[in-house]
């Protein structure tokens, strides 16, 4: 049995996370289900892709990564399982782009699972099947794989080259872009270097590169190599997003 690591933008105010975990528990009662994140910004694929990139190196190899950030739910976008050192289940919308830089998938399958049925329902009532694929499509597939069952039982195999990817690239520089922001307002960039003592330019500002936040005065901007190995821009005890007016996709340049 393999553990399942579950990431979504469902939040915790509604029962969506619990319902998905209930389906997992019913179909695969043995494997552990570990929450990666559920308070991601709704429908933000770049933020979710970064969260998976940040977490993946610390997950046990062979684990099932169930990720549901799915703006196109119910449309023609595909539902997939992809197999590498880890196993990925989710929408084929680029969500796994950065994770697959670390772990390129070797095989991929379209998902055609049976849909879970509710244990109680009003007479003549049936749940909608187009808006909750986390429950109806991805959870059954993740449970199947967590039990070690063959992926061929999920649906037809497809070439891994056809899997969707976001137009993102990590680079040594000198130019990159703001990839996303964490909850503190720190800007995570696509740059893989942060030469201490140098500077970066972003949002029309020249920002010093240091090892950590406390090496600049409170309220001052600073760039540094973040915990996931990407250059980040922060404001010591503040929000770089707000204080510097930064936005996703904004150019960043090593000076």
UniProtKB/Swiss-Prot annotation:
UniProt EC number: 3.13.2.3
Which reactions are catalysed by this chain?
(R)-S-adenosyl-L-methionine + H2O = adenosine + L-methionine + H(+)
Site positions for Important for activity: 70, 77, 133
Ligand binding (adenosine): 9, 70, 186, 235
Q: Where does (R)-S-adenosyl-L-methionine bind?
A: 186, 227, 232, 235
Q: Report keywords, A-Z.
A: Hydrolase, S-adenosyl-L-methionine
- Disulfides per UniProt: none
Q: Does the keyword Protein transport apply?
A: no
In Pfam terms, one family for this protein is SAM_HAT_N
Any one Gene Ontology MF annotation carried by this entry is: hydrolase activity
Has keyword S-adenosyl-L-methionine?
yes
What does the annotation say about its assembly with partners?
A: Homotrimer.
Functionally, this protein is described as follows: Catalyzes the hydrolysis of S-adenosyl-L-methionine (SAM) into adenosine and L-methionine. Does not have chlorinase or fluorinase activity.
What family name appears in the similarity comment? Belongs to the SAM hydrolase / SAM-dependent halogenase family.
- Under which name does UniProt file this protein? (R)-S-adenosyl-L-methionine hydrolase
Its organism's taxonomic lineage begins at: Bacteria, Thermotogati, Deinococcota, Deinococci, Thermales
């Amino acid at each position: 049995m393999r553990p399942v690591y579950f990431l979504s933008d469902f939040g915790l105010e509604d029962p969506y996370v619990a319902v998905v975990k209930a389906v997992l528990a019913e179909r695969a009662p043995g494997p552990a289900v570990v929450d990666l994140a559920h308070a991601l910004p709704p429908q933000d694929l770049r933020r979710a892709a970064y969260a998976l990139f940040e977490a993946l190196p610390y997950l046990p190899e062979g684990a099932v990564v169930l990720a549901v950030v799915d703006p196109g739910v119910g449309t023609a976008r595909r539902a997939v399982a992809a197999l590498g050192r880890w196993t990925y289940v989710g929408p084929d919308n680029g969500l796994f782009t950065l994770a697959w830089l670390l772990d390129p998938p070797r095989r991929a399958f379209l998902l055609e699972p049976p849909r879970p049925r509710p244990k109680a329902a009003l007479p003549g009532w049936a749940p909608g099947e187009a808006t909750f694929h986390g429950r109806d499509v991805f959870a059954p597939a993740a449970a199947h794989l967590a039990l070690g069952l063959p992926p061929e039982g999920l649906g037809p195999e497809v070439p891994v080259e056809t899997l969707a990817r976001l137009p993102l690239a990590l680079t040594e520089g000198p130019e990159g872009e703001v990839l996303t922001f964490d909850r503190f307002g720190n800007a995570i960039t696509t740059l893989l270097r942060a030469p201490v003592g140098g500077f970066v330019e972003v949002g029309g500002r020249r920002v010093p590169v240091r090892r950590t936040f406390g090496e600049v005065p409170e309220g001052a901007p600073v760039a540094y190599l973040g915990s996931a190995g990407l250059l980040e821009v922060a404001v010591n005890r503040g929000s770089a997003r707000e204080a510097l007016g930064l936005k996703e996709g904004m150019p960043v340049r090593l000076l």
